[in-house]
Design a protein with these regions (language model features):
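PEST-like, low-complexity acidic/proline-rich intrinsically disordered segments
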Residues: 1-14, 38-43
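Aromatic (phenylalanine/tyrosine) cluster motif
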Residues: 4, 8, 15-21, 26-29
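Terminal leader/tail segments of proteins
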Residues: 26-205, 209-252
């Protein structure tokens, strides 16, 4: 039996404590708002634990079907910005039967496939955990710009969309996204609603939770496309993960 000595044991203990702190912190965040964890299995993304299943507005479980990061490269140095987890109802596969049996690589390169994910009438949660701290106002401007450009490209940018985006920018101006802060983008169909709504929930250690509702259907759609939009998605690692996991689900 190999002997590593006290140095190894101390390092291992430190890692276990550090990881357990993040795990407990994450679970504390995820029970805020309408979202609750389900079970104890997790997927670790950049030392951040994402539960394999959560429960949203209904008793239906949502499964972690995609995960990844956003990052930038400066002078050949990778800077990781956020970790992402995408939760979908298992019923999503019923709306993707056209792609049944297709390999993951084909799905990853097919924007129509991701458009079908975006438009499928199932509950979705996109969970974003901050790695590199950033002002909320900076994040809000990035989101607003990406959504506005997509709306304009589809000729859907009118006064109602502009007003909704202004409210989103105001919401993010009121928060600070320090490391381990959490944003939930929760998409669902309220009873009798014709279009989905989104709720943005913010949690951060030592700060009061904040949330806002997004009711403009066009803006809701483009927020989803920012994260789930195939080749135009903000995180290609997440897109690849979604393609791999959904290819497995569609092969069953």
């Amino acid at each position: 039996m190999p002997i590593y000595g006290d140095g190894y044991r101390n390092l291992n203990s430190h890692f276990h404590f550090h990881f357990q702190f993040r795990l407990n912190n994450f679970f504390r965040f995820i029970v805020h708002g309408q979202i609750k964890i389900m079970g104890s299995e997790v997927e670790v993304v950049e030392e951040i634990a994402f539960p394999k299943q959560i429960v949203g507005t209904t008793t239906k479980p949502l499964s972690l079907l995609g995960h990844g990061i956003t990052d930038i490269e400066i002078h050949f140095l990778q800077i990781k910005l956020t970790a992402i987890g995408v939760y979908l109802e298992p019923a999503i596969v019923e709306h993707l039967q056209q792609w049944k049996g297709k390999p993951a690589k084909d799905l990853e390169e097919d924007d129509d496939f991701f458009d079908a994910i975006v438009s499928a009438p199932v509950e979705k949660v996109i969970r974003v955990v901050v790695i590199k701290e950033i002002k909320g106002s900076q994040y809000g401007v990035q989101l607003e710009s990406a959504v506005r450009d997509r709306l304009a490209a589809d000729d859907k940018y009118e006064e109602e969309e502009e007003a909704q985006l202004e409210k989103i920018v105001e919401f993010f101006q009121s928060i600070y996204l320090k490391t381990h802060s959490v944003l939930n983008f929760h998409f669902h169909f309220p009873p009798a609603a014709r279009t989905p709504v989104a709720q943005i929930e913010f949690s951060s250690e030592g700060k009061e939770d904040a949330k806002m509702k997004v009711e403009n259907g066009n803006v809701v759609e483009m927020i989803k496309k920012w994260y789930l939009g195939g080749s135009r998605g903000v995180s290609q690692a997440t897109i690849s993960s979604l393609a791999n996991n959904l290819a497995i689900e569609l092969s069953k």
